[in-house]
Amino acid sequence: MKASELLQKDQAALNKELADLLKAQFGLRMQLATQQLTNTSQLKKVRRDIARVRTVMTQKANQK
């Protein structure tokens, strides 16, 4: 997800997006631990998406 798309969302939508990404990250970590994950680059993508969401949330909080 692009940062420009995240900037258009409100705080509730960002919280929901963050929760979804954290669940996805947990699932990917479990797949990696049980050697079921074949595309390990997904971990990096999800981790960076989480960072983007948290950055946008911080930016919006500092604007107020």
Curated annotation (Swiss-Prot):
Q: Which Gene3D superfamilies match?
A: 6.10.140.1970
Q: Which NCBIfam families match?
A: L29
Could you identify this protein by its name? Large ribosomal subunit protein uL29
According to its UniProt entry, this protein's organism is Burkholderia multivorans (strain ATCC 17616 / 249)
User: CDD domains per the record?
Assistant: Ribosomal_L29_HIP (cd00427)
Record has DNA-binding as a keyword: no
Q: Which GO terms describe its cellular component?
A: cytosolic large ribosomal subunit
Is Ribosomal protein given among the entry's keywords?
Answer: yes
Check the UniProt entry and state the signal peptide residues, or none.
none
GO BP terms in the entry: translation
**Record's family?**
Belongs to the universal ribosomal protein uL29 family.
